């Protein structure tokens, strides 16, 4: 059975991974914008 400590570590690692995934998505999305969109 999974313990409270293992569950806490798993949820923290999952949370950090998802946060970094969102940050990476926004970074990539902001730096690969269309040139025509920047001209407006």
From Swiss-Prot:
Membrane topology: Single-pass type III membrane protein
Residue ranges of coiled coil: none
TM annotation in the entry: 5-25
One GO biological process term: protein N-linked glycosylation
A family per Pfam: Ost4
InterPro entries according to UniProt: Oligosaccaryltransferase (IPR018943), OST4 (IPR051307), Ost4p_sf (IPR036330)
Positions in the Lumenal compartment: 1-4
Sequence ranges on the Cytoplasmic membrane side: 26-40
Entries under PANTHER family matching the protein: DOLICHYL-DIPHOSPHOOLIGOSACCHARIDE--PROTEIN GLYCOSYLTRANSFERASE SUBUNIT 4
Complexes and interactors: Component of the oligosaccharyltransferase (OST) complex.
Its biological purpose: Subunit of the oligosaccharyl transferase (OST) complex that catalyzes the initial transfer of a defined glycan (Glc(3)Man(9)GlcNAc(2) in eukaryotes) from the lipid carrier dolichol-pyrophosphate to an asparagine residue within an Asn-X-Ser/Thr consensus motif in nascent polypeptide chains, the first step in protein N-glycosylation. N-glycosylation occurs cotranslationally and the complex associates with the Sec61 complex at the channel-forming translocon complex that mediates protein translocation across the endoplasmic reticulum (ER). All subunits are required for a maximal enzyme activity.
Family per record: Belongs to the OST4 family.
UniProt protein name: Dolichyl-diphosphooligosaccharide--protein glycosyltransferase subunit 4
Lineage: Eukaryota, Metazoa, Ecdysozoa, Arthropoda, Hexapoda
């Amino acid at each position: 059975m999974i313990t409270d400590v293992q569950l806490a570590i798993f949820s923290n690692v999952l949370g950090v991974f998802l946060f970094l995934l969102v940050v990476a998505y926004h970074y990539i999305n902001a730096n690969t914008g269309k040139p025509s969109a920047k001209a407006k």
